[in-house]
UniProtKB/Swiss-Prot annotation:
Cited function: Responsible for synthesis of pseudouridine from uracil at positions 955, 2504 and 2580 in 23S ribosomal RNA.
InterPro entries registered for this protein in UniProt: PsdUridine_synth_cat_dom_sf, PsdUridine_synth_RluA-like_CS, PsdUridine_synth_RluC/D, PsdUridine_synth_RsuA/RluA, RluA_PseudoU_synthase, S4_RNA-bd, S4_RNA-bd_sf
Gene name, Swiss-Prot/TrEMBL: rluC
Catalytic activity: uridine(955/2504/2580) in 23S rRNA = pseudouridine(955/2504/2580) in 23S rRNA
Protein's recorded name: Ribosomal large subunit pseudouridine synthase C
Key words, A-Z: Isomerase, RNA-binding, rRNA processing
Organism whose genome encodes this protein: Escherichia coli O6:H1 (strain CFT073 / ATCC 700928 / UPEC)
Source taxonomy: Bacteria, Pseudomonadati, Pseudomonadota, Gammaproteobacteria, Enterobacterales
Listed PROSITE patterns: PSI_RLU, S4
Amino acid sequence: MKTETPSVKIVAITADEAGQRIDNFLRTQLKGVPKSMIYRILRKGEVRVNKKRIKPEYKLEAGDEVRIPPVRVAEREEEAVSPHLQKVAALADVILYEDDHILVLNKPSGTAVHGGSGLSFGVIEGLRALRPEARFLELVHRLDRDTSGVLLVAKKRSALRSLHEQLREKGMQKDYLALVRGQWQSYVKSVQAPLLKNILQSGERIVRVSQEGKPSETRFKVEERYAFATLVRCSPVTGRTHQIRVHTQYAGHPIAFDDRYGDREFDRQLTEAGTGLNRLFLHAAALKFTHPGTGEVMRIEAPMDEGLKRCLQKLRNAR
């Protein structure tokens, strides 16, 4: 075990940091400190803004001076996210684009975007270890743990606000590639089916089509056909949890190796065909958005990993 005892910090709030709640700001300043401890020091008045006590919901203003007390964090050495860890180092190799406002990476399958829920490592924690000097690193959107591909991270609060606005106004276009069961009918260009999210006692999220759910739409285009499968391009119009996975299942064409909404018989066929596939075949292939700093329209593409490419080549050869 090691114990870290940082000294008192006084942080002047910049215009870019203004507008966020003090509890969220402290989470970026006190990396690795449990939320319960952050709320405790707020409740006790150990955190001061302009020498006054504040509540967790206080919104910071430019020019505010925040006093952050010393926080003792006992942690196991091996559990700390270290820049020397192999996974953290590997993140440097999958960065597709970076400037002062944003960072875009090709997230590997099997890596969560956030640590927690029993996971010791997440992309955002890894990036913070990789970029310890960065004052701000926040996810613009999410990808499921087993989905690979384009993931956008904001390096400024103003960039995060701009990109979130684009998401709300449907000004951001996401394209995914999915390998689905059977022959997708070319005339099925869109699936519109409301989705309802349920949280099981285990904490697991399950989504199903329900008239009580939120309106949801995904557009589809056939990219390539194989003997018993189809590669489709999926473009979600709305951004619901597990949307593409549930919409393909609803259309009768579940995604390969989807342990929640898939078809084991389809997975077995792929295994017997020698594809070597053992992960969800859902890849965020491209993201189109307006750059929050320059106003330039950008389209960033993420190549598929070798495992997905090999799988498709096997299916081509078997036609």
